[in-house]
Amino acid sequence: MIYSTRASILVALVIWGMAACSTAPRSPEGRDDLVRRAAAALTAWNQEIPGVEGFARQSVGYAMFPEVAKGGIGIGGAYGRGVVYERGQHIGYAGLSQGTLGLQFGGQAYKELIVFDDKAALERFKQGRFDLSAATSAILVKWGYAASVRTVEGFTVFYKPLGGFMREMVVAGQSLSFAPR
């Protein structure tokens, strides 16, 4: 029980520390670059998995994270920035922070697409009341192509490793933030 409490506190502190990073790039050039990279990442993904781009663009809204960096040895974390769209219009920026604790070793980069299936999920996200709850993940090894999709209350998450090597069996919590355009 004490280990569980300490682990929960540690994961929360890692997430809190990464959440302190800014959600939107500070310079106009940085924001423009992020928008370009997000659009290119979604288009490239659609070439590998036809229909992903259409699914996102026809939804209520979506957040595209062109690159999230993740690493850990025992304790780990991830951070990335993304672009948020509502009905196809760029409305803001998103920050993704993740804290992990458990058996893990390595580092990787991945892209993530969060599609909001309904208006309520998008509004929760914009109001800062949107976290991907803690979950236990299985061992993940990325040597080539891999992709996963999961649907949770009001949103669908697409995930694709870009590179690196990561083995993990962890408890993780992912926090998301939003900054209007």
Task: List each language-model region with its residue ranges.
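C-terminal motif of bacterial Sec signal peptides marking the signal peptidase cleavage site
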Residues: 17-20
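Small-residue-enriched, tightly packed secondary-structure blocks
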Residues: 22-181
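Bacterial N-terminal signal peptides that target proteins for export
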Residues: 1-10
